[in-house]
Protein backbone atom coordinates (compact mmCIF):
# COMPACT_ATOMS: atom_id res chain seq x y z
CA UNK A 1 0.00 0.00 0.00
CA UNK A 2 1.46 3.33 -1.05
CA UNK A 3 1.61 6.69 0.70
CA UNK A 4 -0.38 9.80 -0.26
CA UNK A 5 -3.74 11.41 -0.90
CA UNK A 6 -4.69 8.95 -3.64
CA UNK A 7 -3.98 5.98 -1.38
CA UNK A 8 -6.12 7.52 1.37
CA UNK A 9 -8.91 8.11 -1.17
CA UNK A 10 -8.81 4.43 -2.16
CA UNK A 11 -8.85 3.42 1.50
CA UNK A 12 -11.88 5.69 2.04
CA UNK A 13 -13.59 3.94 -0.88
CA UNK A 14 -13.12 0.60 0.89
CA UNK A 15 -15.24 1.91 3.76
CA UNK A 16 -18.40 1.57 1.63
CA UNK A 17 -17.29 -1.58 -0.18
CA UNK A 18 -18.65 -5.09 0.36
CA UNK A 19 -15.20 -6.22 1.56
CA UNK A 20 -15.03 -7.23 5.22
CA UNK A 21 -12.38 -8.57 7.59
CA UNK A 22 -9.46 -7.34 5.51
CA UNK A 23 -5.85 -7.40 6.69
CA UNK A 24 -3.18 -4.89 5.68
CA UNK A 25 0.44 -5.89 5.23
CA UNK A 26 2.21 -2.71 4.26
CA UNK A 27 5.19 -0.48 4.82
CA UNK A 28 3.27 2.55 6.14
CA UNK A 29 0.01 2.98 8.08
CA UNK A 30 -1.98 6.05 7.01
CA UNK A 31 -5.13 7.83 8.22
CA UNK A 32 -7.44 5.71 6.06
CA UNK A 33 -6.24 2.50 7.67
CA UNK A 34 -7.09 3.80 11.14
CA UNK A 35 -10.58 4.63 9.88
CA UNK A 36 -10.96 1.09 8.47
CA UNK A 37 -9.73 -0.40 11.77
CA UNK A 38 -12.26 1.73 13.67
CA UNK A 39 -15.07 0.57 11.37
CA UNK A 40 -14.09 -3.08 11.73
CA UNK A 41 -13.47 -3.42 7.98
CA UNK A 42 -9.78 -3.95 8.66
CA UNK A 43 -8.94 -6.45 11.40
CA UNK A 44 -5.18 -5.89 11.55
CA UNK A 45 -2.55 -3.63 10.01
CA UNK A 46 1.10 -4.66 9.92
CA UNK A 47 3.68 -2.04 8.92
CA UNK A 48 7.07 -0.49 9.58
CA UNK A 49 5.96 3.09 10.19
CA UNK A 50 3.13 5.60 10.40
CA UNK A 51 2.47 8.49 8.02
CA UNK A 52 -0.42 10.22 9.76
CA UNK A 53 -1.93 13.67 9.65
CA UNK A 54 -1.52 15.60 12.92
CA UNK A 55 -5.21 14.93 13.70
CA UNK A 56 -4.93 11.18 13.11
CA UNK A 57 -1.69 10.99 15.13
CA UNK A 58 -3.35 12.75 18.08
CA UNK A 59 -6.38 10.44 17.79
CA UNK A 60 -4.16 7.34 17.68
CA UNK A 61 -2.17 8.50 20.71
CA UNK A 62 -5.31 9.26 22.72
CA UNK A 63 -6.91 5.87 21.91
CA UNK A 64 -3.84 3.64 21.67
CA UNK A 65 -5.37 0.94 23.88
CA UNK A 66 -8.24 0.52 21.39
CA UNK A 67 -5.73 -0.32 18.66
CA UNK A 68 -3.80 -2.82 20.78
CA UNK A 69 -3.66 -6.13 18.94
CA UNK A 70 -4.80 -4.47 15.70
CA UNK A 71 -1.55 -2.68 14.77
CA UNK A 72 1.75 -4.53 14.44
CA UNK A 73 4.99 -2.66 13.79
CA UNK A 74 7.80 -4.71 12.28
CA UNK A 75 11.33 -3.97 11.07
CA UNK A 76 11.57 -2.92 7.42
CA UNK A 77 13.47 -6.14 6.68
CA UNK A 78 10.29 -8.05 7.51
CA UNK A 79 7.56 -5.74 6.22
CA UNK A 80 9.23 -5.39 2.82
CA UNK A 81 10.65 -8.91 2.55
CA UNK A 82 10.04 -10.19 -1.00
CA UNK A 83 9.31 -13.77 0.06
CA UNK A 84 6.76 -12.70 2.69
CA UNK A 85 4.99 -10.38 0.26
CA UNK A 86 4.82 -13.20 -2.28
CA UNK A 87 3.69 -15.88 0.20
CA UNK A 88 0.95 -13.69 1.64
CA UNK A 89 -0.48 -13.07 -1.84
CA UNK A 90 -0.61 -9.32 -1.30
CA UNK A 91 -2.53 -6.98 -3.55
CA UNK A 92 -0.13 -4.04 -3.72
CA UNK A 93 -1.39 -0.49 -4.17
CA UNK A 94 1.17 2.20 -4.96
CA UNK A 95 1.01 5.75 -6.25
CA UNK A 96 2.77 7.09 -9.31
CA UNK A 97 3.77 10.35 -10.94
CA UNK A 98 3.48 9.08 -14.51
CA UNK A 99 3.03 5.83 -16.40
CA UNK A 100 3.59 5.22 -20.07
CA UNK A 101 1.43 3.32 -22.52
CA UNK A 102 3.68 0.26 -22.10
CA UNK A 103 3.11 0.11 -18.33
CA UNK A 104 6.45 1.50 -17.15
CA UNK A 105 5.96 3.62 -14.01
CA UNK A 106 7.78 6.68 -12.70
CA UNK A 107 7.14 7.02 -8.96
CA UNK A 108 9.87 9.47 -8.00
CA UNK A 109 10.67 12.26 -10.46
CA UNK A 110 8.60 15.11 -11.85
CA UNK A 111 9.38 15.79 -15.51
CA UNK A 112 12.16 13.19 -15.31
CA UNK A 113 14.60 15.27 -13.30
CA UNK A 114 13.05 16.85 -10.17
CA UNK A 115 12.87 14.38 -7.31
CA UNK A 116 9.40 14.40 -5.75
CA UNK A 117 9.87 11.52 -3.31
CA UNK A 118 11.78 8.29 -2.80
CA UNK A 119 10.80 4.90 -4.12
CA UNK A 120 10.35 3.47 -0.62
CA UNK A 121 9.04 -0.08 -0.53
CA UNK A 122 7.03 0.24 -3.73
CA UNK A 123 9.60 -1.80 -5.64
CA UNK A 124 9.43 -4.65 -3.14
CA UNK A 125 5.64 -4.75 -3.26
CA UNK A 126 5.28 -4.12 -7.02
CA UNK A 127 7.63 -6.93 -7.97
CA UNK A 128 6.44 -9.52 -5.43
CA UNK A 129 2.72 -8.93 -4.93
CA UNK A 130 0.09 -11.28 -6.32
CA UNK A 131 -1.45 -8.25 -8.04
CA UNK A 132 0.53 -5.03 -8.49
CA UNK A 133 -1.69 -1.93 -8.81
CA UNK A 134 -0.68 1.70 -9.27
CA UNK A 135 -3.23 4.46 -8.70
CA UNK A 136 -3.11 8.11 -9.72
CA UNK A 137 -5.21 11.05 -10.82
CA UNK A 138 -5.15 11.12 -14.63
CA UNK A 139 -3.75 14.67 -14.69
CA UNK A 140 -1.72 17.10 -12.60
CA UNK A 141 -1.42 20.90 -12.52
CA UNK A 142 -5.14 21.54 -13.05
CA UNK A 143 -5.32 19.18 -16.00
CA UNK A 144 -2.31 20.60 -17.84
CA UNK A 145 -0.08 17.53 -17.39
CA UNK A 146 -1.18 13.97 -18.15
CA UNK A 147 -0.11 11.17 -15.82
CA UNK A 148 -0.41 8.71 -18.72
CA UNK A 149 2.24 9.47 -21.33
CA UNK A 150 3.66 7.87 -24.51
CA UNK A 151 7.02 7.21 -22.80
CA UNK A 152 7.86 7.75 -19.13
CA UNK A 153 10.54 10.39 -18.51
CA UNK A 154 12.03 8.17 -15.79
CA UNK A 155 11.32 4.52 -14.91
CA UNK A 156 11.24 3.15 -11.36
CA UNK A 157 9.00 0.13 -12.07
CA UNK A 158 9.44 -1.82 -15.28
CA UNK A 159 6.49 -3.04 -17.32
CA UNK A 160 6.88 -6.61 -16.05
CA UNK A 161 6.29 -5.48 -12.44
CA UNK A 162 3.14 -3.47 -13.17
CA UNK A 163 -0.15 -5.29 -13.69
CA UNK A 164 -2.84 -2.64 -13.16
CA UNK A 165 -2.88 1.15 -13.53
CA UNK A 166 -6.00 2.96 -12.30
CA UNK A 167 -7.07 6.60 -12.68
CA UNK A 168 -10.43 8.23 -12.02
CA UNK A 169 -11.05 7.62 -15.75
CA UNK A 170 -10.71 3.87 -15.30
Regions found by a protein language model. Give the residues of each.
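Conserved phosphate- and dinucleotide-binding cores of soluble alpha/beta proteins
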Residues: 1-169
Amino acid sequence: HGVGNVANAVLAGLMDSPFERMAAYTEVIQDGMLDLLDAGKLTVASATAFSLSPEAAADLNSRMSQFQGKIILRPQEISNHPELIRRLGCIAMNGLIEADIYGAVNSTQVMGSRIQNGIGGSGDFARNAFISCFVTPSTAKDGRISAIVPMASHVDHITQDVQVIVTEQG
